[in-house]
Amino acid sequence: MPTIQQLIRHGRSMKASKTASPALEKCPQKRGVCTRVYTTTPKKPNSALRKVARVRLSNKIEVTAYIPGEGHNLQEHSIVLIRGGRVKDLPGVRYHIVRGSLDTSGVADRKQSRSKYGAKQPKAGAAKK
């Protein structure tokens, strides 16, 4: 425990908080180019083939980003927009690709939570039975 004299000389230092998405460099989103699009398996209790892409960002940093939603049109050299947000059961995946922006299409036939997946509002005639 410091003495009062030591506190007068040095003061208390604030602990610097670490960002969860350092590659974004304090930006809300960043643009990048897909270098590889592939599937990977999640951690122990879960089982699936999760779609991910290796993305080279405009600041030359290469990251792994998750492709949300069912089906996608991404391939190598697709230009994508990424945002922060990790995937809990995929180690090393700390970013999400934004659906419906740049080369990424929105999720087809999405009825709920459409804004999160870049899906347009369905036509009024199609919704009625």
Swiss-Prot record:
The modification 3-methylthioaspartic acid is found at D89. InterPro entries: NA-bd_OB-fold, Ribosomal_uS12, Ribosomal_uS12_bac. Residues 101-129 are annotated as: Disordered. Residues 116-129 have a biased composition (Low complexity). CDD domains: Ribosomal_S12. GO terms for molecular function: rRNA binding; structural constituent of ribosome; tRNA binding. Keywords: Methylation, Ribonucleoprotein, Ribosomal protein, RNA-binding, rRNA-binding, tRNA-binding. One of its GO terms (biological process) is translation. GO terms for cellular component: small ribosomal subunit. Part of the 30S ribosomal subunit. Contacts proteins S8 and S17. May interact with IF1 in the 30S initiation complex. With S4 and S5 plays an important role in translational accuracy. NCBIfam families: rpsL_bact. Belongs to the universal ribosomal protein uS12 family. This is Small ribosomal subunit protein uS12. It comes from Chlorobaculum parvum (strain DSM 263 / NCIMB 8327).
